Amino acid sequence: MELNIKENHDEMEKLLSATIDDSAANNVPNIIVFSGYRSTGGMSDQEAADNCVTFLKRIKSRVEDKGVNICMELLNSKVNHRGYIFDHVEWGVDVMERVDSTRIGFLYDIYHAQIDDGDVSRTIHNHFKFMKHFHTGGVPGRWELSDDQELNWRYIAKVIADLNYEGFVGHEYSPMPGSDPAACLKQAFGIFNV
């Protein structure tokens, strides 16, 4: 369900409350949510942000009490998710500043961020306090991580580690055709083992 649609909020709160309780009971630290799409409801980005803030404030005390993070995922709208609202970090920062919770932030998907914003390491430094989880994926193509892509993954791993991040990094990619999936994952783990 999309957080930008106010008509969804009651049902989302009910479903998400159960998920928060289950996550806390099973030591699952993060729950991923999505902002929604511009085409849904025909609203402006500002109205969508306001609606997301309203909903996130409704669940704020529950996640703080239960010790679970809500992570709104950043996705690119240029290649993979046309019309997705949270496609630039600054939009998400505005939402998170207004929600004002140490338990509500965003999933910084580095693949998506590189496509729509770039400037990955500076963005991580500037907005790390809102980043509750990270995803990777080779740019371009969302293939496995390697040293012949746009991003220096080892450097990014060091940036994240230097900020004392203790959470998970999800390697969310597809191995290139003909690649060994296990070897690709081992390579990603090696890159991020800093």
Where are these regions (language model features)?
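Histidine-acidic metal/acid-base catalytic patches
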Residues: 21, 28-29, 86-108, 112-194
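Active-site acidic/histidine proton-transfer and metal-coordination neighborhood
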Residues: 1-105, 115
